[in-house]
A protein has these predicted regions:
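C-terminal alpha-helix
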Residues: 132, 181-188
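Hydrophobic/aromatic-rich alpha-helical bundle segments in the mid-to-C-terminal region
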Residues: 79, 100, 113-124, 137-184
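Helix-turn-helix
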Residues: 9, 13-51, 55
Length: 188
C-alpha cells in the first residue's frame, strides 16, 4: 500500500471537509490537526486557502470526469443511467454531499478561477446527461417535452439540490425523485 504524501493527505482531507462543511467551514488549523503537521507547513503546499480549494475542485472534477468516461456507452441506456446515479444515491445518508454542489452555494466567496471550474463541472455533467438522453430518444415512443440539453440541466440541478435537501430532511426522497425522472426518461 502506497503511503500518501503530506500534500496528498491535505488534499484528501480537504475533499472531505468541503463536502461536509463547505469552503468557510474549515481552516488550515483543522487540516493541520488531521494530518499532524504545523499550520505553517500547509502554506508550503497551498499558499492560500483559495489555492487549496482550486486544487480540490480540480482533483474532484478529474475523478468524476474519469468515472463518467468509464461508463460504457454500449450498455443499455438504463444501465448507463444507473451507473451514473450510483454516487448520488450513495451520498444520501452520509455526511458528505457533492463537493462542487457544496461550493456552488458559496460562489460569492470564491475566487473567479474556482467559479469557472465549478461551471465546468456542471457543464460536464449536463453534457453527459444530454448525450445519454439523446441516445435514449430513438427508443422512446414520445419525444421529450423539452430538448435533451434542457432536460439534462433539470435532472442535474435536481440531483444537486436533492443532495442538499437529503441532508436537511434526513431522507433521500428528493434524490430518488430526480433519479426516477432520469430513469423514466431513458426507459421510454
Amino acid at each position: 500500500m502506497k503511503t500518501q504524501s503530506v500534500r496528498e493527505q491535505l488534499l484528501e482531507h480537504t475533499l472531505v471537509l468541503i463536502r461536509r462543511r463547505g469552503f468557510n467551514g474549515f481552516s488550515y488549523r483543522d487540516l493541520a490537526e488531521l494530518v499532524g503537521v504545523k499550520t505553517s507547513s500547509i502554506h508550503y503546499y497551498f499558499p492560500t486557502k483559495e489555492d487549496l480549494v482550486q486544487e480540490a475542485v480540480k482533483e474532484y472534477s478529474a475523478r468524476l470526469a474519469e468515472r463518467i468516461r468509464s461508463i460504457d456507452t454500449s450498455l443499455p441506456v438504463t444501465e448507463q443511467a444507473a451507473i451514473y446515479l450510483a454516487p448520488f444515491r450513495a451520498s444520501c445518508g452520509s455526511d458528505q454531499i457533492c463537493l462542487c454542489g457544496m461550493l456552488s452555494t458559496e460562489t460569492l466567496c470564491l475566487p473567479e478561477p474556482v467559479h469557472k471550474m465549478l461551471q465546468g463541472f456542471y457543464l460536464m455533467n449536463e453534457q453527459w446527461l444530454a448525450g445519454l438522453l439523446e441516445r435514449a430518444q430513438p427508443q422512446r415512443s414520445t419525444p421529450f417535452p423539452v430538448p435533451p440539453a434542457r432536460l439534462a440541466q433539470v435532472v442535474f440541478g435536481s440531483l444537486q439540490s436533492g443532495l442538499i435537501a437529503a441532508r436537511l430532511f434526513g431522507t433521500s426522497d428528493r434524490v430518488e425523485a430526480a433519479a426516477d425522472t432520469l430513469m423514466a426518461a431513458v426507459a421510454g
